[in-house]
Amino acid sequence: MPDIALLPSLRHTCLQVTNQHAIDSPISVGLISLGCAKNLVDSEIMIGNLIKDGISITNTPEEADVVIVNTCSFIDSAQEESVDTILESAEMRKVRNLGQGLIVAGCLTQRYRKELPKLMPEVDVFMGIDQVEEVSQLVQVARKRRLQRPSEAESTSEEASPSEESPDSAPEAPVMEVTARPVYIPDVNTARFRLTPSHFAYLKIAEGCNHPCSFCIIPRMRGSHRSRQAEDILAEARALIAEGVKEINLISQDSTYYGLDLRENPHRGIASPEKFQEASASLPENASTLSSLLRDLNQLEGDFWIRVLYTHPAHWTDELIATIASCDKVAKYVDIPLQHIHPTMLERMRRETSRDYIEKLLERIRKGIPGIAIRTTFIVGFPGETEGCFRSLLDFIQDTRFERMGVFTYSHEEGTRAGGMANAIEDSEKAHRRDRAMAIQRDISRAWASEQVGKIFKVLIEAQADEKTLEDAKVRSWEHGHLRSDLEPQAPALSADEPWMVARGQADAPDIDGRIYVRGSLPTHTFQQVRITGHTDYDLLAEPA
């Protein structure tokens, strides 16, 4: 089970904590945050509200009066991790603190709000996305429910084992505070305690999704797309910059859809490139779009990067390409999940794009943004994916030569259109196809890394590398975070006998991309100029320029 509430110091938070009672509160909470960066922001909001209301946060499970598990339910493996974490928390409670309340939040509760109370009676409270700012009240509810179980309190006597929870003590059903279709979206005044290191942050510009992708359950869990007002986003960005944040990562379910719902008569369900271009062309000059937002962010004072994550290929415009190219503070980096390239697969996935459109879009992006690094992801083993469809994808990967790429095996998700499709692929074949695709990408990435040797990069210094970090770097793989134990070390020059710094360039998003290892000691959380001197399959080696 992940560690409970691995919190940074208070200097990392956007929230000004002045309530001394937060330290001496009789109620303490531990929080386990699972899933993506968007879910992490929800966890930050929950912790911010808890601290604001005088509830203390603990890193130690046995010290927590209430444990919150913020779950992910995007794919089967994430759902399994969420369920396992909930059940482990409930089981550990029997031996560490029978009076400990248990709250389950996030996407799992949104997806299975009707089923979970019967499936998990050991949970005290289920809360949804709309309730993240009500977390303090729900913590009180969970705590009260646990303290009202006298038979549990007595179970520590000689007649009862502390590891045995009396079924008579359980309430009839957990409290369920989950709305069917979330509408919540944070604003600049939302209490928030950042869980990222002090030098970078995630800034959520929108919530929800309007796309009809057949494999995805997100619209059902997160609701329809809803954008924040541009001035509200700018105000939050200013606050982050004032705190010393050097990299602002813009996140949402579809960042390229940003602003289209803010117009007077918003279009609903826009998906195809043609419909999107038509809607964009009719926007007034002062309308909020991702392009206008980036231009406004670029005008803010300070030395920082802006990185755009989670774009959709159907919603790119020539204006957006030109904006990224011209804004010096916007990282020359494109995160654009394509999922597949074969026409049959794109149609079955309901991606609303074609191979011809995708190829022309990538050509426009590379031509319009010199030095751009393109990250994409693909799904292999989707129902009906023949060997021919898959080979078409392999050829496309080989020809396009993405700087950054991830491959996921298709996850069967009930409640999705794809969940009822015939011609399912065996799990072993899915894994084999993923490995074949990543083998091609490994060679592409290594060739790209070799081309960077001798170049001067501006990098963000993150931390000093310890011995384990250096050892992992020698055999690190992007294949979903696994280490390549089958390979000989690729970077013998990475020695713990001398200092190395861990850094990232514009081509490296936090947690998902490569690293740059800089020889020597440099101040952390600063931008530095370095010269690339070597590489591994996925990482670069450098020295101060």
Regions found by a protein language model. Give the residues of each.
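Proteins enriched for Cys/Gly/acidic motifs involved in redox and nucleic-acid/cofactor modification
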Residues: 1-258, 289, 319, 334, ...
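Terminal RNA-binding accessory module
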Residues: 2, 11-18, 420-545
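Conserved SAM/AdoMet-binding glycine-rich loop
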Residues: 102-103, 111, 242-388, 398-399
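Intrinsically disordered, low-complexity domain-flanking/linker segments in eukaryotic proteins
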Residues: 149-166, 266-283, 468-497
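Short flexible coil/turn linkers enriched for glycine and charged/polar residues
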Residues: 196-199, 209-211, 330, 340, ...
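Conserved, mostly hydrophobic/aromatic
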Residues: 213, 233, 250, 308, ...
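Active-site proximal loops enriched in glycine and acidic residues that flank catalytic Cys/His/Asp
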Residues: 252, 310-312, 338-340, 376-380, ...
